[in-house]
A protein has these predicted regions:
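Fe(II)/2-oxoglutarate oxygenase catalytic core
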Residues: 1-150
């Protein structure tokens, strides 16, 4: 399954043969900066075509091989998981670039779902020890009552 795609270093993870590590080379990252910078994060949120466009930019740089590989990995019961990331964090890569990259990867796999809690098509999680929200979903110890008033 592991094939060679120019601009990517693809190998089996050292800890588990079920995980495929995909490193994105600096040269390819530099080619992504211009098409990714055409759109800001707000455009990604509200304009579906922008999400498609950045996904296409990523896939075009791999001659449409990356989307095929990612889907094969996820559908293969012997693997089912991949880690894709820049090989090196170059100075032009920031959090917004990484959100755009993950959005592009998600769209290469399939149509992503809308995250209603975050209100976005992508998710950014800040991991903290405490959660002060009032959501019942995050408080398993609170009884949920069923209402019969319609």
């Amino acid at each position: 399954m592991i094939e060679k795609i120019e601009g990517f270093e693809i190998k089996t993870n050292n800890d588990s043969p079920r995980i495929i590590d995909i490193g994105i080379n600096d040269e390819l990252l530099n080619k992504l900066i211009f098409p990714f910078n055409k759109f800001d994060i707000t455009a990604l949120e509200y304009k579906p075509f922008t999400r498609f466009t950045i996904a296409k930019s990523l896939d075009d740089l791999s001659n449409n091989k990356l989307s095929k590989l990612l889907n094969e990995i996820l559908r293969d019961r012997n693997t089912g998981c991949f880690i894709i990331k820049p090989k090196k964090m170059i100075s032009k890569i920031d959090n917004n670039f990484l959100v755009k990259l993950s959005t592009a990867v998600a769209h290469l796999i399939g149509k992503p779902n809308y995250d209603a809690m975050a209100g976005k098509y992508y998710a950014r999680f800040f991991v903290r020890h405490e959660d002060e929200s009032d959501s019942y979903l995050r408080k398993a110890y609170i009884n949920m009552d069923l209402h019969t008033d319609g």
